Amino acid sequence: MTSPHNHMAYLKHHVLMTVDADHHRSLRTRLGTQHVLTKIQGIKTKESHGAFQFAEDKARLEAVSRSILLKRARTNKNKNALKEINVEKVDSILVTSEAVHDDIDEIYHATIEDECGILNQD
C-alpha cells in the first residue's frame, strides 16, 4: 500500500487539477478562449495536471517497487527450498521408477512370447 502521506498528496493534486480544469472551462465559457485570464488559467491547469501526473507516477513506481521486492523474496524462498531437497532421495525415486518400467517391459514381452507359444501349440 502507498503511505498515507503519498496518498494524501495524490488526492490533493487530483483535487487541485479538477478545480483548475473546472475554473478554466468556466472562464472559457464566460470570457472566451482569447481572454488573458482564460490563457493564464489554462497554463495553471496544465501545471496542476503535470503535478498530478507526477504524483500518479510516483504511486505507480512505489507499487512496482513493492512487487519487485515481493518477487525477490519469493525467489529467495524457492531457492532455499530447492537447496533443502535431498538429492539422494530424488535419485533413488528415479532409479526405482526406471526399474519398475523395466520390469513392466519384461513382463509384457514375456506375455507376448508366451501367447505366441500357446498359439503355436494349439
From Swiss-Prot:
It holds the Pfam family DUF2664. Belongs to the herpesviridae UL96 family. This is Protein U68. It comes from Elephantid herpesvirus 1 (isolate Asian elephant/Berlin/Kiba/1998).
